[in-house]
């Protein structure tokens, strides 16, 4: 069995599920999952867990993510991104400066509340929102709290001849953030219709775009029996507090017994040497093995 983490560069035009399906065929391994859905049009880092690493994938999805994208001011779309149909157009504000945009972007820092877009996989009454949207049905969408730790403009304002304005941005955000909704809400705060015209995920769960592999690159390496694209399972627990255990504690964990450890963290990644051997969960004053990986 193959075990480990893959830093996949998902290309535009495929869903996260498509990427997993292709890797299952390529690696001849059924036990593969991804750490955080990317929309089909979005390029970027998609953490992939293989074999035993699928047992820690949930801890990768909790990690914050970094995106780089582009906002277009002047019209909104059904999907809040460039793939949708135009819903409304508006003239740019009489005064639209880089200083005003920057100042407005700072108002989104910290904890904010978002309403997920209709074209999203959020479920309401057992159905995904995009199913309601495609059927032309309206439904009340649940608002959610997310955290924005960075939101900044990374290019000058580019005014076009057809009355639009575009600029690039970078955002660091918590799990569950809809960046296209952030682009729409920014436009609303500036008093103009808007949408997200480009997006790529540049970092997720400690993995970066610079070191990511495309499916084509992985296929080429597999054909040469080269597996260096596969990272150790330890990458999957990089965001959990680490606790090094001794031989006696290792034996106790292997039997599923509780341990008394000097920590107050709700979850710990237990290491024996350089290897992660279990995820421990705080129960009263002791730690119980939640997932044993040996």
From Swiss-Prot:
EC class, as a word, reads isomerase
Q: Give the domain of life.
A: Bacteria
**Location of the active site:** 39 (nucleophile)
GO MF annotation terms:
RNA binding; tRNA pseudouridine(55) synthase activity
One Pfam family linked to the record: TruB_C_2
Spell out the protein name for this chain: tRNA pseudouridine synthase B
Its family?
Belongs to the pseudouridine synthase TruB family. Type 1 subfamily.
* Record-linked PANTHER family: PSEUDOURIDYLATE SYNTHASE TRUB1 (PTHR13767:SF2), TRNA-PSEUDOURIDINE SYNTHASE (PTHR13767)
Q: Which GO terms describe its biological process?
A: mRNA pseudouridine synthesis; tRNA pseudouridine synthesis
Q: What does this protein do?
A: Responsible for synthesis of pseudouridine from uracil-55 in the psi GC loop of transfer RNAs.
Q: Which SUPFAM superfamilies does the entry link to?
A: Pseudouridine synthase
UniProt EC number: 5.4.99.25
- InterPro entries membership: PsdUridine_synth_cat_dom_sf, PsdUridine_synth_N, tRNA_psdUridine_synth_TruB, TruB_C
What is this enzyme's catalytic activity, as reactions? uridine(55) in tRNA = pseudouridine(55) in tRNA
Keywords, alphabetical: Isomerase, tRNA processing
